[in-house]
Amino acid sequence: MIQPGVRDRRQRRLLIGLALLFFAPLALAFYLYYGPGTWRPGGRVNSGDLVRPARPLPALALPLLEAGSTDANFLKRKWTLLYVQSGACADSCRMRLYDTRQVRLALDRDTNRVQRVLIAGDGCCDAQFLHEQHPDLIAIRATPAAAPLLALLPDRDQGSAAASLAQAPRVYLIDPLGNLMMVYPAGSKAKGMLEDLKRLLRLSSIG
């Protein structure tokens, strides 16, 4: 008969082993991207701008453009491509949404490991356009509730949500633990974004 103390120690070791198995690949991915020497697979550099150190983003339940709101942890569990838009979604905005959609679809069997999020100001997007062209998009209304999140995005105004929305459009990459880790400036290519995501997904088993 196994003594209770021995059984408890075995269970603890098993739980520790499972935790290491789950988180070690993501830790490795972070080390390779943020660690000394800035090593990259195949000697290639990432296309996005690294956020050093990665920034934990707040858990917030935010209102959707239509009815309802997000779960407070909606930026966790998956890799997230976040785009922020103020005013009407003109050609440059539509092209950015198109790029992120195509990048996600090009991941093939890993498509479901990535989600797309839009934070939009008043008058941004036509509901029919979003339904027809971007049915997978999580479209969030930029209210004051989003200000703590927007304030943590690099190169954005630290004041109101409206002021932050007025900055140049970028795509932000968030890891499955809710950390902002990379920024794609306006004009960056979708191909580079895709290559970065493929490498990260290959190195990480979570999300």
Protein language model features and the residues they cover:
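Structural signal for membrane-spanning alpha-helices in multi-pass inner-membrane proteins
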Residues: 29-33
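Short active-site neighborhood of thiol/selenol oxidoreductases, capturing the structured segment around
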Residues: 72-100
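Short, internal strand/loop/helix patches
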Residues: 117, 122, 128-169
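N-terminal "domain-start" segment that seeds a small globular fold
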Residues: 16, 24-27, 37-73
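N-terminal Sec-pathway targeting helices
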Residues: 8-22
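Thiol-/selenol-based redox modules, centered on thioredoxin-like
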Residues: 159-207
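Structural microenvironment flanking redox-active thiols in thiol-disulfide oxidoreductases
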Residues: 95-135
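N-terminal Lys/Arg-rich, disordered targeting/topogenic segments
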Residues: 1-9
